[in-house]
């Protein structure tokens, strides 16, 4: 009881910094280190969000949110405090206040919705340009760090292969080892290909215009309003190439389908390209990132570190089989970039 009263007192104090009359407050969500309260005010319903992160990091995100809002991206308005701050916080906890927006759920299996999402991603990347964080904020950047990231993931994969070999009777480990050598080889080839690509050139261009990525581009952050995607919140961002978001989105879609659908990929990339055109050399960087076995590495990471404590062995085994199916079926397009690049541009022109 004391903890609940203490929490209510903190929330009340946080809300007192905003220029609204508060009618009612109710805890709406509490998961993954984040709490969300629905707040009824004299200016309509709001959402107060608490995150376990330093205020300097939250400031980097909330100022980016305001930047996107100023650029006209469809995004829930973020509110400033009476003193003009975009967030509040102490030590490791931060708070921000947004308008509550409601719309139609967006799903990965809806082809037309996904095309709209890819188009939205293009608008997002355009709107992100020119963002310069303040000195008080703590920025996050992966620009120029792909080589290091790839090497780290490959080292972890090799380590997980050794762990798997020590559990010969474990079903997950048996399946993992059957495919690990191929995934390791493909990852090493992607690392080599990165050296021969225009990754460094694209990185320098991105550094100059200051664009950022969503980092965790998931449909849970979006809703559909009047037939178009609308961003409910900016969960996390990082300075990086826009292709990072494309890789994450495409992988998420294909995992839902349990197989890589090359024709669908072309249609999705064409929708993005119509808003944010990429050169063939830039698509080559995306192809390299898609070739790297991010999905296979991720499920191994989760299993051997026991990150999903609520998952059963059956769920882990199903997830592994699904990741393998998607990773293996990528062979159908990875060596066809020139042909598929032309298809993406032609599809874009035809639609």
From Swiss-Prot:
It is found in: Spore coat. InterPro entries: CotS-like (IPR047175), Kinase-like_dom_sf (IPR011009), Spore_coat_CotS (IPR014255). Belongs to the CotS family. The lineage of its organism: Bacteria, Bacillati, Bacillota, Bacilli, Bacillales. Keywords: Sporulation. Disulfide bonds: none annotated. GO terms for biological process: sporulation resulting in formation of a cellular spore. Seems to be required for the assembly of the CotSA protein in spores. The keyword rRNA-binding does not apply. It comes from Bacillus subtilis (strain 168). This is Spore coat protein S. GO terms for cellular component: endospore-forming forespore. SUPFAM superfamilies: Protein kinase-like (PK-like).
């Amino acid at each position: 009881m004391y903890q609940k009263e203490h929490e209510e007192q903190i929330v009340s104090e946080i809300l007192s910094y905003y220029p609204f009359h508060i009618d009612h407050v109710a805890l709406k969500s509490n998961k993954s280190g984040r709490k969300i309260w629905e707040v009824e005010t004299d200016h309509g319903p709001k959402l107060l969000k608490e995150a376990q992160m330093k205020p300097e990091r939250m400031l980097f995100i909330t100022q980016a949110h305001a930047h996107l809002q100023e650029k006209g991206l469809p995004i829930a308005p973020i509110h400033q405090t009476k003193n003009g701050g975009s967030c509040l916080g102490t030590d490791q906890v931060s708070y921000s206040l947004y308008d509550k927006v409601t719309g139609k759920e967006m799903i990965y299996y809806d082809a037309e919705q996904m095309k709209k999402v890819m188009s939205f991603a293009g608008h997002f990347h355009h709107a992100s340009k020119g963002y310069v964080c303040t000195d008080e904020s703590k920025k996050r950047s992966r620009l120029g760090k792909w080589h290091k990231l790839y090497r780290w993931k490959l080292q972890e994969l090799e380590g997980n292969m050794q762990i798997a070999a020590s559990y010969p009777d474990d079903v997950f480990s048996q399946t993992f080892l059957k495919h690990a050598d191929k995934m390791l080889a493909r990852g090493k080839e992607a690392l080599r290909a990165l050296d021969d690509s225009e990754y460094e050139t694209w990185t320098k261009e991105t550094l100059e215009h200051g664009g950022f990525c969503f980092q965790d581009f998931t449909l849970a952050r979006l809703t559909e309003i009047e037939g178009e995607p609308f961003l409910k919140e900016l969960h996390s961002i990082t300075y990086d190439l826009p292709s990072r978001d494309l890789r994450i989105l495409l992988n998420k879609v294909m995992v839902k389908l349990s197989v890589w659908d090359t024709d669908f990929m072309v249609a999705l990339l064409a929708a993005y390209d119509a808003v944010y055109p990429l050169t063939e050399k830039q698509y080559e960087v995306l192809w390299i990132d898609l070739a790297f076995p991010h999905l296979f590495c991720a499920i191994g990471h989760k299993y051997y570190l026991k990150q999903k404590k609520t998952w059963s062995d059956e769920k882990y085994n199903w997830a592994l089989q699904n990741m393998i199916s998607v990773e293996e079926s990528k062979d159908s397009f990875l060596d066809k970039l020139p042909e598929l690049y032309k298809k993406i541009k032609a599809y874009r022109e035809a639609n």
